[in-house]
Structure formats: structure tokens, C-alpha cells
């Protein structure tokens, strides 16, 4: 059990803060007495959450409405916080989305936006906020990946590739940052109850109907515990952990075929 922090309060920045796992992280950090910087594309929802959480938890909440598919957004977020003298102690790179379909038929611009949000933005924000953490000698970064990171994903090829990048990137910099006081955790949830599947168009797939998915609150709680303990890789659910390890021992071609069968409608 983690005790709510005492003064001075630390500040957590959470991207994709208005829904799903991101919203549950917002609730968790607020309940542990963190001031919040919430980033999301949904400005109206941001304002509503900021006002409600300020009153409920008596914390400072800064809302920043940004489209993270725009390449200048990470720098704009960083500069806005610098100007406001808000220093980030915990960075939660949660924002992301997926696209379903055959690669030769999916929309290129949508996939480039996805690469920007899922991959480039995480790299950019981490680069911007990490330096101060290292100079201070403390800080935490949580990057949200997926069990998709552990194998190729036909029918969601670009999405799976971005999640593999997040896993590899996070593990590498976690190693680089040993003995600095800064930890990096990568959260790799399996399919989770959220609006993600509606956006990808997979909510009515047989896979989704047959699968017992974790709820976002449980996933966030497991990720939060792992982050606070300084774990590098966190995979919620025993079944997900077993599957993530099992693919290492199978031929890659076979793993890819199985992945395609699972993804298929």
C-alpha cells in the first residue's frame, strides 16, 4: 500500500488523460495527492475533469488541450509548463490508438498520425522532461505499451510495431538510467475495456466477444504499483504474462500466423 505523499506535492503529467487507462491514472495520482497536468485532445472533457478534481482532491490541475498527432505538440506542452514554472516529477505517456486492416488498404495519413502519437510523441516528451529529472536525481516515467509488443500483428501491423518500439525503448533507457534516481516503467496490458476497440473497429470482432478483458481501473492500478516500485516491465494478468513469455520459444513465422488468426474477425 502506498501512502499519499506529504508536502511539497509532486506533479504528474498524463497524456490521454480523459478516458480509459489514462483517466484511471488521473484518478489514482489525484488520490495520492499529486498535482496534475492533464493532456488530451478533448478540451471540454479536460476542463470538466480539471474543475471536478480540483474541488474533490484539493490539488492543482493544469489542463492542456493538444492534438498529439501534430509534431509541434510535445515542444508546446514543455514550453507552456516551463513558462508556468511547473516541474514534472512523473511522466505518464499513455496516449495512443490503433488502426485495423490490411496494410495495403489502410489510410496512410491515419497511420502516420498513429506513429506520431504512439511513437514519436513518447520519445519527444521523454527527451524533454528526462533531463531535468536526471539533474534533480529523481523522477519516474511510465510508458504504456501493450502485449502487442511481443509479436508481429498482421491486420494491425503498424500499431503492433509502435508498441514493440515502446517496449524496446523503455527497457533500454531504464538500463541507461540505473543509479540516477530516475526509473522507467513500461506497462504492457492485454485487451482492456475502453474506447480503444471502437476506434480500431474491432469492438464487434469475434475475438473481442469471446475474450474476457481487464477493466481499465485494474490495469491502471497494476501499472501504478509497478511504477512506484520501480519495476521495468509490467504485464497485468497471469495469462498475459505467460503468453508474452511463450512467444519467445516458438518460431516467429508460427507466432505471426497465430497472431493473425487471433486478430481476424
Kindly give the residue locations of the regions a language model identified.
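C-terminal helical subdomain
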Residues: 186, 207-243
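Active-site helix of classical SDR
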Residues: 126, 162
Amino acid at each position: 500500500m502506498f501512502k499519499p505523499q506529504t508536502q511539497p506535492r509532486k506533479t504528474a503529467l498524463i497524456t490521454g488523460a480523459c478516458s480509459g487507462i489514462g483517466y484511471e491514472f488521473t484518478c489514482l495520482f489525484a488520490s495520492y495527492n499529486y498535482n496534475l497536468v492533464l493532456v488530451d485532445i478533448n478540451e471540454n472533457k479536460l476542463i470538466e475533469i480539471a474543475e471536478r478534481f480540483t474541488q474533490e482532491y484539493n490539488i492543482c490541475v493544469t489542463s492542456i488541450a493538444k492534438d498529439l498527432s501534430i509534431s509541434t505538440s510535445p515542444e508546446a506542452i514543455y514550453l507552456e509548463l516551463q513558462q508556468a514554472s511547473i516541474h514534472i516529477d512523473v511522466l505518464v505517456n499513455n496516449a495512443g490508438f490503433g488502426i485495423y486492416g490490411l496494410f495495403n488498404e489502410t489510410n496512410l495519413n491515419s497511420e502516420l498520425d498513429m506513429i506520431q502519437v504512439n511513437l514519436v510523441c513518447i520519445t519527444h516528451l521523454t527527451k524533454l522532461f528526462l533531463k531535468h529529472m536526471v539533474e534533480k536525481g529523481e523522477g519516474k516515467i511510465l510508458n504504456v505499451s501493450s502485449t502487442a509488443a511481443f509479436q508481429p500483428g498482421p491486420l494491425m501491423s503498424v500499431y503492433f510495431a509502435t508498441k514493440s518500439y515502446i517496449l524496446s525503448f523503455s527497457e533500454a533507457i531504464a538500463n541507461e538510467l540505473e543509479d540516477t534516481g530516475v526509473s522507467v516503467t513500461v506497462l504492457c496490458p492485454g485487451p482492456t475495456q475502453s474506447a480503444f476497440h471502437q476506434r480500431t473497429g474491432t469492438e464487434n470482432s469475434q475475438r473481442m466477444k469471446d475474450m474476457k478483458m481487464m477493466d481499465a481501473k485494474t490495469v491502471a492500478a497494476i501499472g501504478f504499483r509497478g511504477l512506484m516500485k520501480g519495476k521495468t516491465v509490467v504485464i497485468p494478468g497471469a495469462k498475459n504474462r505467460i503468453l508474452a513469455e511463450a512467444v519467445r520459444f516458438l518460431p516467429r513465422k508460427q507466432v505471426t500466423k497465430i497472431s493473425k488468426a487471433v486478430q481476424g474477425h
